[in-house]
Amino acid sequence: MPLNARIICCCLLPLTVSAWAAESPAVRAAAEDKAQALEQKVADQQSPKTAPQAAPLSKSEAQAVDPAGQAPLDDALTCLSRTLYWEAKGGETEDMEAVADVVLNRLGHEGFPGTVCEVVKQGSQKSPCQFSWWCDGRPDQVEEEQRYSVAKEIARKALNQQLKDRTGGALYFHDRSASPDWARAYIKTVEIGSFLFYRPKDLAAR
């Protein structure tokens, strides 16, 4: 390579890296804003006339959020992705998709909180957690980046409402290895992968 070409490349490289570093937080912030709008659209689905317009999240936008699985749990995409990662840890893709169905079913139900983060953290203050990973006393940071990338892609599709609800409107689920007493009072809607799914007979939140 000619000397002058090498000098040009060396000069351009820091600029390219600097531009990427500057763009990444902007892309992440924009993606989080999109996820919040999509979250609100799901929460307001019982009143479609008032539901906000929301552009879908792209794959690259979703992957820009919480890339290492270490970020605070304070935005819709991170809270949903981390829930799918931990609740379905060791399971198949269908397990993650089904857990996402339950989170969004709750988000769109008047008896549950109005944000994804509030849904997945519900119960941590006064009663047993609705989602066990949130208060099991273990670190919440991701251990497998590739699997977390899959979880984020499923979370993206869920927030975009691109996943068909295969749980039959379930609001609750448990692992096949468990036999919780509460399940006796509910209607089992379906079995998917590692989980059994339920909804209350009167569709009221418990």
Language-model features: where?
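Hydrophobic helical h-region of N-terminal Sec-dependent signal peptides
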Residues: 9-13
